[in-house]
From Swiss-Prot:
It catalyses: sulfate + ATP + H(+) = adenosine 5'-phosphosulfate + diphosphate. Residues 168-171 are annotated as: G4. This is Sulfate adenylyltransferase subunit 1. One of its GO terms (molecular function) is ATP binding. It comes from Escherichia coli O127:H6 (strain E2348/69 / EPEC). With CysD forms the ATP sulfurylase (ATPS) that catalyzes the adenylation of sulfate producing adenosine 5'-phosphosulfate (APS) and diphosphate, the first enzymatic step in sulfur assimilation pathway. APS synthesis involves the formation of a high-energy phosphoric-sulfuric acid anhydride bond driven by GTP hydrolysis by CysN coupled to ATP hydrolysis by CysD. Heterodimer composed of CysD, the smaller subunit, and CysN.
Length: 475
């Protein structure tokens, strides 16, 4: 066992007391990003090492791996703690997103180590989608690069408001204050173009030597600010979803026997309580919450982020992909929306193409009506393009095969975030953030009888593999 962990458990009064204390610590999800070879994996390894999160057998294995695959000469290659794929170790790079957990006396952390190569931008966007803070690594010798700008923009696009700019490898520039100041000013000039009100902090450090990571550096007396770990432990994260209206996307209809019918999912935002009047969209049918069922038993109320099963007082038609919200709230379905898209496929995104999309628990199809612009990541200007290339970021107009209930992504990432899927290969080719729902869904002229419309709805619900189109959607 990790001796530091064993000592901590003993200080807490035993395993049970230690586990209770862990449950009450706040959790921060953050990612490391930046250009290739800026030291992201090494920084995470240093954080784990200096906070004593490495077991003795892991440390012994790390010494052996450093001799075989290490890139730091005689020194311990801490990046190998995170780079687990054989291809990563052979090339000395990060390819996949690696997740690690650690905790201190003040907070719990989940880290996403994302790749720096441009061709793996899709993996970086995946890692950023669940994070609340981003550590942007900058090599002190190279300064602000294209990938630094791209990752900064993607992070803010995905709703991350806290950016920590870690200027790494200060040991290779003789811990120069002038270098730190120059890079800081360069980044602030670029950051002025980023959308939203951002909390940006700068820390000069050396992940390899441990300077300003978990302890103050004696080599940089000119820096009097907090260490990186102190920033992570003290930053205040305000979760937007807690203050937002209730959103409960239905993931699964739970009917284990004839006496129970519940609707399972994760509460995306707001809160729900027993007795509350709720509305089901898109049908608009209302009911009351009879029970809130969890793994630990029934609850009187639940909050954003909790996995629950809702039991309603009425037997009504609810399926996967439907959305429950407060009965007094109005949220119209829309047939189209403008969406910020990060494109992840070799084949460019072009107008006229159709894709499957998934948003919350809903799966349907969408057509690309047009590309308004692509963002130039160097200066964040908008330029007209005919298609969106691999790793391109732009605003795209989508029309859906059926009316959807959406939020803007900045208001609710769950009901405003979607993925685009190639219908032939079933590969995810794009990540989308709803920028603006642009038109309210309206019924087509009454060219079909009531029976035909009801039959169409029945076939689409129970026989989706037939591929029947929505008559009301005029498709």
């Amino acid at each position: 066992m990790n001796t530091a962990l064993a000592q901590q458990i003993a200080n807490e009064g035993g395993v049970e007391a230690w586990m209770i204390a862990q449950q009450h610590k706040s959790l921060l999800r953050f990612l490391t990003c930046g250009s290739v070879d800026d030291g992201k994996s090494t920084l995470i390894g240093r954080l784990l090492h200096d906070t004593r999160q490495i077991y003795e057998d892991q440390l012994s294995s790390l010494h052996n791996d450093s001799k075989r695959h290490g890139t730091q000469g005689e020194k311990l290659d801490l990046a190998l703690l995170v780079d687990g794929l054989q291809a990563e170790r052979e090339q000395g790079i990060t390819i996949d997103v690696a997740y690690r957990y650690f905790s201190t006396e003040k907070r719990k952390f989940i880290i996403a180590d994302t790749p720096g190569h441009e061709q793996y931008t899709r993996n970086m966007a995946t890692g950023a989608s669940t994070c609340e803070l981003a550590i942007l690594l900058i090599d002190a010798r190279k300064g602000v690069l294209d990938q630094t700008r791209r990752h900064s923009f993607i992070s803010t696009l995905l709703g991350i408001k806290h950016l920590v700019v870690a200027i790494n490898k200060m040991d290779l520039v003789d811990y120069s204050e002038e270098t730190f100041t120059r890079i800081r000013e360069d980044y602030l000039t670029f950051a002025g173009l980023l959308p939203g009100n951002l909390d940006i902090r700068f820390v000069p450090l050396s992940a390899l030597e441990g300077d300003n990571v978990a302890s103050q550096s004696e080599s940089m007396p000119w820096y009097s600010g907090p260490t990186l770990l102190e920033v992570l432990e003290t930053v205040e994260i305000q979760r937007v979803v807690d203050a937002q209206p209730m959103r409960f996307p239905v993931q699964y209809v739970n009917r284990p026997n004839l006496d129970f019918r519940g609707y399972a999912g994760t509460l995306a935002s707001g809160r729900v309580e027993v007795g509350q009047r709720v509305k089901v969209l898109p049908s608009g049918v209302e009911s009351n919450v009879a029970r809130i069922v969890t793994f630990d038993g029934d609850r009187e109320e639940a909050f954003a982020g909790e996995a629950i099963t809702l039991v309603l007082t009425d037997e009504i038609d609810i399926s996967r992909g439907d959305l429950l919200l407060a009965a007094d709230e109005t949220l119209p379905a829309v047939q189209s929306a403008s969406v910020d898209v990060v494109w992840m496929a070799e084949q460019p995104l072009s107008p006229g193409q159709s894709y499957d999309i998934k948003i919350a628990g809903k799966k349907t199809r969408a057509r690309v009506d047009g590309i308004r612009y692509q963002v130039d990541i160097n200066n964040l200007t908008q330029r007209e393009v005919e298609n969106l290339p691999l790793n391109g970021i732009g605003l795209v107009d989508l029309t859906f095969d059926e009316p959807l209930v959406l939020d803007r992504y900045q208001q609710n990432p769950v009901t405003g975030g979607l993925i685009l899927i190639d219908r032939l290969s079933n590969v995810t080719v794009g990540a989308g953030m709803v920028h603006e729902p642009v038109s309210q869904a309206t019924a087509a002229p009454s060219q079909f009888s009531v029976f035909e419309l009801e039959l169409n709805a029945l076939v689409r619900r129970h026989f989706p593999h037939w591929g029947a189109r929505d008559l009301l959607g005029d498709k």
